Regions:
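Bacterial N-terminal signal peptides that target proteins for export
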Residues: 1-10
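Bacterial N-terminal signal peptides
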Residues: 9-19
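Low-complexity, Gly/Pro
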Residues: 11, 23-30, 59-60, 98, ...
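Alpha-helical membrane-embedding segments
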Residues: 17, 64-67, 166-167
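Conserved polar/disulfide-associated segments of primarily extracytoplasmic proteins
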Residues: 49-139, 144
Length: 167
């Protein structure tokens, strides 16, 4: 019995010492009637919202939201997202706008990126629209400090890799 306890303690210590080791939770977008699923780190502050999910990194330098949108209303959804960013004191520098096609796990859409600033300094901001069905799509809202983006690059890659349409 003492040998088993030692092994359990050794394993627990090893797991606790692993850098970046975090359990993650999957969310369906929206819930119910899912068209997509995304997995977010457990150590991020995640909240289910009316049309999806939003999450902020544990160091509070990165914000992501994944929401369902009606494709016929996508212009309104983008405008609403920009208004929401402004309500969070995020200022977008429209002169830095870059737009391009993007494909995430078979979903091809459009991404618009800007430089901006918030109360903490410079930020990177993007809005991405991904059609999933003939009538519904996802809008991804992203805002992060340049340093936060670097520090959370692995988690951000994992989030993007996890975003998949529900078939």
């Amino acid at each position: 019995m003492p040998r088993l306890t030692f092994r359990a303690c050794l394993l627990a210590g090893f797991m606790a010492a692993l850098p970046g080791f975090a359990i993650a939770k999957s969310y369906t977008i929206p819930d119910p009637g899912a068209i997509a699923v995304v997995t977010l780190p457990d150590d991020w502050d995640t909240t289910e919202i009316a049309k999806g999910v939003e999450s902020k990194s544990d160091d509070e330098t990165v914000y992501v939201a994944v929401e369902v949108t009606e494709l016929k209303d996508v212009s309104k959804a983008i405008a609403d997202s920009i208004v929401w960013l402004k309500s969070q004191d995020v200022e977008i520098d429209r002169s830095t706008q870059k737009q391009g096609d993007i494909t995430i796990n078979g979903m091809t859409g459009v991404q618009v990126k800007w430089d901006g600033k918030d109360e903490d300094g410079p930020t990177h901001v993007s809005l991405t629209v991904l059609p999933v069905t003939d009538s519904k799509g996802l809008i991804l809202t992203y805002w992060a400090s340049p340093e936060g983006e670097k520090d959370n690059l692995k988690a951000l890659g994992t989030i993007i890799d996890s975003l998949k349409p529900v078939k």
